Each structure stands twice: as structure tokens, then as C-alpha cells.
């Protein structure tokens, strides 16, 4: 992800240190790796880290592997949310953020509802990282362009990686 400051065109690369982060559809293999990476970083971490999915068994497994207690010992408030069992996932996730939305949102499934939820929970200068590569060349999802213009929200895609990425993730 990246962030900006109003009046400046300089991009601050990476998640917002001490910010609010959400990982949607985040308990598959790549999501588990992401949770591990976020919880073990020494240089930068969110204060709030919300991980969602619609599969309770997978959420339970993630919560066993990466406990709230371990996250708390690292200064991170970790929450697991089954968005398939709440009436309004966007409202629930925004409430968890304290109503401000999230600084960094990662969408880990090429599913229209996931991407649209990601867009709808962004806070000011929020970055949506579309990590999951769709195979459908016609894949689309709605985006609030009012928020892009007036709220400085932005979307980026992540695909592949390089040797430096692998070395960093293994540290």
C-alpha cells in the first residue's frame, strides 16, 4: 500500500504505521502468510488488524495459529470476523474501526462483494490493495469515485513478487 499527505505529491510506501488494517477473505494460504508477516514485522505495524472470511472453520484455524494474545503482545488489536454471518458486513467493519474506516485494506479474493466491501470500508487516504488476481478478464466491481476524489482513497494491485520480497517475508 501507499499513503499521501494533502498538498504533497510524495507517496509514502507501505502500510500506515499504527494505522487500521483489514484483510478481507484473508484466511487462505496467502492470507495466513500475510497475517504472519504483519504480526512479526519489527519496523511497521497496524494498531488494529481485522481479518475476515466467510468460512468459520478457516477463521478458527487462523485464530489458533495467530492468536489475539500474541498480536496484543506485539501491540496489535487483532480481530477475526465472519462476514458471512453478520447482516451488514460494511457497517460491522466500519464500527470496529471506530467509524473512521481503514488505512490499509487488502482484498485477497477476486470476488465482487469482497472488492466492493474493501472500497466501502476505506478511511481518508485509505489504500485498497487488490492482491487476488482474477482469471476473468471482464472482472469488475463498483468503486466510490467521490471518495477517490474527496477522500484521497486509492486502489492498487499487487501481482507476483521478486527475490527481495521473498527474503523480507522469510526474515
Language-model region placement:
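Short, well-ordered alpha-helical microsegments
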Residues: 31, 59, 114-116, 166
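Glycine- and other small-residue-rich loops at beta-strand/loop junctions that grip anionic moieties
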Residues: 23-27, 51-52, 81-83, 103-108, ...
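A generic alpha-to-beta junction signature in SAM-dependent methyltransferases
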Residues: 15, 42-43, 97, 121-123
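A short acidic, Gly/Pro-enriched loop at the edge of an enzyme's catalytic core
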Residues: 87-105
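C-terminal hydrophobic helical "lid"/dimerization subdomain
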Residues: 70, 86-92, 116-120, 124, ...
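C-terminal substrate-binding/catalytic core of Rossmann-like NAD(P)-dependent dehydrogenases/reductases
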Residues: 90-95, 136-171
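Mid-domain Rossmann-like dinucleotide-binding core that forms the NAD(H)/NADP(H) cofactor-binding site
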Residues: 1-85
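ADP-ribose/adenylate-binding Rossmann-like module
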Residues: 104-111, 120-141, 154-155
